[in-house]
Amino acid sequence: MSDWSLDQARKTYSIPHWADGYFDVNDAGHVVVRPTADGPAVSLPEVVDAARAAGAKLPLLVRFPDILGQRLGKLQAAFAQAQADWDYAGGYTAVYPIKVNQHRGVAGTLASHHGEGFGLEAGSKPELMAVLALSRPGGLIVCNGYKDREYIRLALIGRKLGLQTFIVIEKPSELNLVLEEARALDVKPGLGVRMRLASLGAGKWQNSGGDKAKFGLSPRQVLDLWKSLRDTEYADSLNLLHFHMGSQISNVRDIANGMREATRYFVELSRLGAKISHVDVGGGLGIDYEGTRSRSYCSINYGLHSYASNIVQPLASACEEHGLPPPRIVTECGRAMTAHHAVLIANVSEVEQAPEGRVPDAHDDEPAAIRHLREIHDELDVRPAVELFQEAQHFHAEGLSAYALGQIDLTHRARIDDLFYAIAHGVRARLSFDEKSHRPVLDELNERLVDKYFVNFSVFESIPDVWAIDQVFPIVPIERLNEAPQRRGIIADMTCDSDGMVKTYVENESLDSSLPLHGLNPGESYRIGFFLVGAYQEILGDIHNLFGDTDAVEVAVDGTGYRIAQQRRGDTTDVMLDYVGYQLDTLRATYAERIAAAQLPPERAQELHDALEAGLTGYTYLSDEPLG
């Protein structure tokens, strides 16, 4: 591809459209990372090499904590601008729900951005224990999820310790528990109520909002709750209105519709006498994983400023119309804060190339299917390409049927495949996406004629949403982008599971069933980056085939370059076996017994013992040595 350029590389992998300025390509063909808008760009391959020199192994999760601060700052700036645009004086707090990524390096980095404009959310007792320690003095903590007395008591203790904890009532039964514990501790609770909106944002997570939502009160339940509360000493404690429109909302109109409905609840509760000082709109702010800037479920058709404006404007108008004091706006946009900051790097372990096909020598006793396929191949440059492929499919299917019925032997069966794939390659060379009639056949051929790149990672551990909900993540080779990719491939992981594959790829501002990739060079490692994996993936990852957590590093970038600020070793085999109930002492004893029973020479026995011990304490993934 003689016209290949760095701009062509950027376009092929849609980098400008999903990277949001944090990732680019340099003159050496390396993916570079720029954590701060005005800061230096660092080569991702160089960072990985430095991490490996320090002892890290592939697959490797690379975190850039500076991006976390940048994302939070952009979100706060967008709301500051929207409040100025709409003359809104209520203020704004960006709350981080730590369920998105509970790792100390993530939640702690965000929590270090002290100030009234940041808070934390917990949805369980372990999460609450973390945020009680992470929160700044006087910090906002939103307490969601199912609650028992202990959870409620811990949240109320947070109030006693000077934290601004709000216990959000999401089930009618929770209110009495909160009031009983508040009286027992002699503390005035901060109460919130979660409304179940009828409006919801379309998408993969749409049932987290709307009438089918797992949490939240109906209008009747909210009225009953207020009646139970208004005549108590805690009537003025109901200060937070919470709702959730959905996660990863693709269409900005869904946000506007949800806010229109939610604002009505704020007005009505205020009219009834509730002192609503905070409106928590939940999550919903999406990430453009695809780079298509569309209403597709893995994309968004809006930006930060549009999102903020659609939140602020309805509340500003309602407060002005009804003479209400503007409440403090709270969002829980954890995905938008964290997705960009982490990249998974994994090496290709093997490539299975697509069949090239060939034309076998002719024989007088050839079955009819082979004769017909040979005739089709001879006419590749003469007849319409689509018509030729359709005929080839027919005779290929006839040949497969004949083999299954025992009418032809294995040699003939192999020749049928050889001819079919030779025809397929010849047909594809004549097709063009510019011709509408060619596109269905070209799509089919691109799916058939692809290489399988076996990559040293687990889909289920590192990008589980790919398997669970067909989530799309940008995938890019982290080097050689100054070379034209000559192959098309699909990515398969190391698990013994046919679902351990990536089926959808970001390419040229669209989606495809395969990805342009380079052929492997002997002795060189070919490393692939999985981007925007900082939200949910680590936390949701499972241990299929006992592949565990990967090695991870945190990289700090400043004006002088970068440094590996922190390194965490991934799971080893003994850790995974212990997790699923194996007694390590028993395993070691069994190995020793079997070595002894083999009656080997002492030196050989020691070699086997050392190899088994190394296997037991080693990384769960494959060696990351270059192929060839």
UniProtKB/Swiss-Prot annotation:
Q: Which reaction does it catalyse?
A: L-arginine + H(+) = agmatine + CO2
Give residues annotated as binding substrate: 279-289
Group of enzyme by EC: lyase
Q: Which residues carry this modification: N6-(pyridoxal phosphate)lysine?
A: 99
Query: Matching InterPro entries, A to Z?
Result: Ala_racemase/Decarboxylase_C, Arg_decarb_HB, Arg_decarbox_C, Arg_decrbxlase, De-COase2_CS, De-COase2_N, Orn/DAP/Arg_de-COase, PLP-binding_barrel
Necessary cofactors: Mg(2+); pyridoxal 5'-phosphate
- Keyword Kinase carried by entry: no
A Gene Ontology molecular function term for this protein is: arginine decarboxylase activity
Q: Which Pfam families match?
A: Arg_decarb_HB, Arg_decarbox_C, Orn_Arg_deC_N
The enzyme's E.C. designation:
4.1.1.19
Q: Give the UniProt keywords, A-Z.
A: Decarboxylase, Lyase, Magnesium, Metal-binding, Polyamine biosynthesis, Pyridoxal phosphate, Spermidine biosynthesis
* GO BP annotations listed: arginine catabolic process; putrescine biosynthetic process from arginine; spermidine biosynthetic process
Query: Which protein family is it in?
Result: Belongs to the Orn/Lys/Arg decarboxylase class-II family. SpeA subfamily.
Q: What does this protein do?
A: Catalyzes the biosynthesis of agmatine from arginine.
User: NCBIfam families from the xrefs?
Assistant: PRK05354.1, speA
- Descriptive protein name: Biosynthetic arginine decarboxylase
Q: What is the species of this protein?
A: Xanthomonas campestris pv. campestris (strain ATCC 33913 / DSM 3586 / NCPPB 528 / LMG 568 / P 25)
